[in-house]
Amino acid sequence: MSSPIVLIFGAGANIGYNVAKEFVASGYKAVLTSRKAPTEPDASFSYVQGDLSDPKSVTDTFSQVRKQFGEPSVVVYNGNSKWHSNKEIAAAVSFTAKEDPFVVDLPTFEKDLNINTTSTFVAIKEALASFAALPETASRTFIYTGNAMNFLPFGGAMTLGAGKSASAHMIAAAAAAYAPKGYKFYYPDERQPDGRLGGRGISGEAHAKIYKKLSEDKTQGPWLQTFVKGTGYVSFPADTDVSVAH
C-alpha cells in the first residue's frame, strides 16, 4: 500500500520543514514546493518547483505531483517563505511606512495577492479534485497558514493583511460547503497566550503538531484554528486584542 501524500506549498526552514518532518514521521510522503530548488535537499522529502506568484503554476504543480506520486490527501498552503529580520514569514509582504500603506504600486500588490490569495484559490480547486478522487478513509484536509491579520491591520504590512483576510474567507467558505463530503479546511493562527499576534516568534514545531492533529480529525472542526504553543487550540473571545503592542 502506497504512503499518503502531503503536498506543502512554501517549503521554508521553519513551518514548511517542521510540518514535512512531522508528517513523514507518521508515514506520509512529503512533497515540498518552492520557487527555487533547495541547495541542500533533505533525502526524506521529495521536491517540485513552482512559483506561487504565477497562479497557473499551482495547476502545473498538482499535475506533476499526481503524475509522479499520486493524489495528495493533505495540502498545506504555507505561502512563499520570505525572510525579514532573520525570521521566516509564511507569506508575501511588501513593507511600507505605517503612515502610508497605499504607497505600494499595483504590480507589487498583484504579486503579493497572487502569492497570498489567488494561488490559494487555485490550490483549493485542485485540492477538491484530488479529494474527490480519494477514498473516504483518506484525510482530505486543506490547511492554510494564517495569522491574526484578518482581525486587525498591522502597520506597514497591508499587502499581507489583505491576502490573509481574503484567504481566511475562502477557507471559511470551503469548510462550510464541503464538510458534508468529509473534506476539511483550516486556517491555523498561532497566538501568544493572551491572544495577541504570534508575530516573528512563531513555532514551526507547534504548527506541525496542530497540522498533524487536524489531518487526523474525522470531521470538520472550527475553520479558524487559533492555537498557542504548548497548549494547542484555544477559542479566544471575539473582542480579544490581537495587537502586538502592550
Swiss-Prot record:
Species, as recorded: Cryptosporiopsis sp. (strain 8999)
Keyword Lyase on entry: no
Stated name of the protein: Short chain dehydrogenase/reductase dmxR12
Gene name of the record: dmxR12
Catalytic residue positions: K164
Keyword field: NADP, Oxidoreductase
EC number: 1.1.1.-
InterPro entries: NAD(P)-bd_dom_sf, SDR_fam
SUPFAM superfamilies: NAD(P)-binding Rossmann-fold domains
Pathway: Secondary metabolite biosynthesis
Binding annotation for NADP(+): I15, S34, K125, K164
PANTHER family documented for this protein: 5-KETO-D-GLUCONATE 5-REDUCTASE, SHORT-CHAIN DEHYDROGENASE
CDD domains per the UniProt record, alphabetical: SDR_c
Family: Belongs to the short-chain dehydrogenases/reductases (SDR) family.
MF terms (GO), sorted A to Z: oxidoreductase activity
Function noted in UniProt: Short chain dehydrogenase/reductase; part of the gene cluster that mediates the biosynthesis of the dimeric xanthones cryptosporioptides. The pathway begins with the synthesis of atrochrysone thioester by the polyketide synthase dmx-nrPKS. The atrochrysone carboxyl ACP thioesterase dmxR1 then breaks the thioester bond and releases the atrochrysone carboxylic acid from dmx-nrPKS. Atrochrysone carboxylic acid is decarboxylated by the decarboxylase dmxR15, and oxidized by the anthrone oxygenase dmxR16 to yield emodin. Emodin is then reduced to emodin hydroquinone by the oxidoreductase dmxR7.
